Amino acid sequence: MGKPEFYDFCVHAVPDGANAVEELSSLSRHLGYSGIALANHSDKLPSKKPVLPSIEGFEVFRGIELVEENPSKLHGLVGKFRSSMDVLIVHGGSEAVNRAALENPRVDILNHPAFDKSSGLNQVLAKAAAENGVAIGITLRPLLHSRGSRRIRMLSDLKANLELARKYDVPLVLCSDAMSCYDLRSPMETLAFAEVCGLEEDEALDALSTVPKKIIKKNRPGPGYVREGIEVLEGEDIF
């Protein structure tokens, strides 16, 4: 079994974050990642489509984190950006937005689902996430920057969502949600922190490696792709 490849699928660069994508990419590669997704919030996109850096042995994926409180408008944004993005994330935070994201198979990840006194998920939404293949994002930055009762609440929400994810087989994605280079953590630090937060070792590995790779495979299908689960093999690929 080869060494796992790790991916951070939510990194914010200027003008959303503090650092340029080149700086974030260089440091992420140094920390041990195989790739990151540049996922600026949709209300803080650069005026021009950014040129993604080319780094040997490392890939920068084009992503976005959609911010929209109106479910109908959110679906419109998904349609607008889906074809041009490797990774499409929705910034949750209300039952209506969470539902709209989790019921849409064109969405890859739902980040920040919690709101008011809710963890953001329930049995119905967890089932929808599993059926539509929408992953729940576990974002490190809010946890690392929180203290006291706020952190306790966030950990409680995470525990509740983990239980639902396990029960309904909902995919999870671990990501830094970095707004600067100072928010980045190595894969080993991320895995260790995830386990402290309640994830099992295999769950954390899947969330930082297996699930991100599945997302890219889904959104960048090969030439023999028909639909999910069906692929036409030709020639030597059959054997």
Swiss-Prot record:
PANTHER family: RIBONUCLEASE P PROTEIN SUBUNIT P30 (PTHR13031:SF0), RIBONUCLEASE P SUBUNIT P30 (PTHR13031). Part of ribonuclease P, a protein complex that generates mature tRNA molecules by cleaving their 5'-ends. GO terms for cellular component: cytoplasm; ribonuclease P complex. One of its GO terms (molecular function) is ribonuclease P activity. Its EC number is 3.1.26.5. GO terms for biological process: tRNA 5'-leader removal. It catalyses: Endonucleolytic cleavage of RNA, removing 5'-extranucleotides from tRNA precursor. The keyword Cytoplasm applies. It is found in: Cytoplasm. Keywords: Cytoplasm, Endonuclease, Hydrolase, Nuclease, tRNA processing. It comes from the Archaea. Consists of a catalytic RNA component and at least 4-5 protein subunits. InterPro entries: Pol/histidinol_Pase-like, RNase_P_comp-3_arc, RNase_P_p30. NCBIfam families: RNaseP3Mthb. This is Ribonuclease P protein component 3. The gene is rnp3.
